[in-house]
Amino acid sequence: MTEEPIKKAIEEIKLFNKKHNLIARGSLNQQVEESVKEGAQLALILQDKESILDLGAGSGLVGITLATKIPAAKILLGESNKKKAYHLKRMIRATQLPNIEVFSQPPKNKKIKVQAITTKAFKTIKDTLDLLDSMVHKPFSVYFLKGREEVFQKELVEANILNKNHEIIKMDSTKDRFIIKIINE
């Protein structure tokens, strides 16, 4: 699959961002570039997954990158903010990717099944895991996109993750960026 859907998604983000503050305008180009790089690195890790939920999808660029680079996977963009969910639906139509959809909220009293969850700038590790326990069938793996190591190490302690199955992956970038993989069985 070509990179064309990613280019279309970026156009949609820039257009939508003129009227709605989806991404801080001063850092738009930097945030877009960073999200594409993060999505590409996650795609390398998640190549074998059939279903992925991008929780707190925001601009949707990480999810669009995943859908473009892993065309066999079903990608769900989890976003409860109505304005952002509207943007995501517009972006999906513009990219014409068949393997991606918006997931606004879980069905009542019913858990969803996905193999992997990605999240960036959503909630703390503990709060995210608590939420996922109530909405996703186990087993699943969560891939947290995190910044400074001292911050996420505190979150790991708070969530009592140090005794659980986890992996810290340094991202290929100049900034302090990490992927924290936690297997939730």
Residue ranges and their predicted role:
Residues Q96-P107:
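Conserved SAM-binding strand-loop segment of SAM-dependent methyltransferases
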Residues S59-P71:
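Conserved SAM-binding loop of SAM-dependent methyltransferases across substrates and taxa
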Residues E149-E185:
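Active-site capping/gating segments
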